[in-house]
UniProtKB/Swiss-Prot annotation:
It comes from Shewanella amazonensis (strain ATCC BAA-1098 / SB2B). Belongs to the universal ribosomal protein uL18 family. The keyword Ribonucleoprotein applies. It comes from the Bacteria. GO terms for molecular function: 5S rRNA binding; structural constituent of ribosome. Coiled coil: none annotated. Keywords: Ribonucleoprotein, Ribosomal protein, RNA-binding, rRNA-binding. The keyword Electron transport does not apply. One of its GO terms (biological process) is translation. This is Large ribosomal subunit protein uL18. This is one of the proteins that bind and probably mediate the attachment of the 5S RNA into the large ribosomal subunit, where it forms part of the central protuberance. InterPro entries: Ribosomal_uL18_bac-type, Ribosomal_uL18_bac/euk. Part of the 50S ribosomal subunit; part of the 5S rRNA/L5/L18/L25 subcomplex. Contacts the 5S and 23S rRNAs. One of its GO terms (cellular component) is cytosolic large ribosomal subunit.
Length: 116
């Protein structure tokens, strides 16, 4: 089993448990160059999204693949979700370690008003 398939296996297990809870989930995906976040409702519809690919977020950043970029995305996704009336979510880290950029995004989202 390689690194990617292990991550996907962890992600599948976590998503199944979140699905059983029936709550909104904050999904995070990261690549070496960008980080993406979505709030998805129990019916699998995207409620809010933010990423470093967006022009408004990218303009304010020096680099899109670092912790500062993750903090900006976390703040943006939380503001957009709260604006749509979603304040409580389950954090879906997509099998990535809760460390570095993933943890920074989560902390920024909590500070901006999301509860998980």
């Amino acid at each position: 089993m390689d690194k990617k398939s292990s991550r996907l296996r962890r992600a599948t297990r976590a998503r199944k448990k979140i699905q059983e809870l029936g709550v909104h989930r904050l999904v995070v995906h990261r690549t070496p160059r960008h980080i993406y976040a979505q709030v998805i409702n129990p019916e699998a519809q995207v409620v809010a999204a933010a990423s470093t690919v967006e022009k408004s977020i990218k303009e304010a950043l020096k680099s899109t693949g670092n912790v500062d970029a993750a903090k900006a995305v976390g703040k943006a996704i939380a503001e957009r979700a709260v604006e749509k009336g979603v304040t409580v979510v389950a954090f879906d880290r997509s099998g990535f370690k809760y460390h570095g950029r993933v943890a920074a995004l989560a902390d920024a989202a909590r500070e901006a008003g999301l509860q998980f």
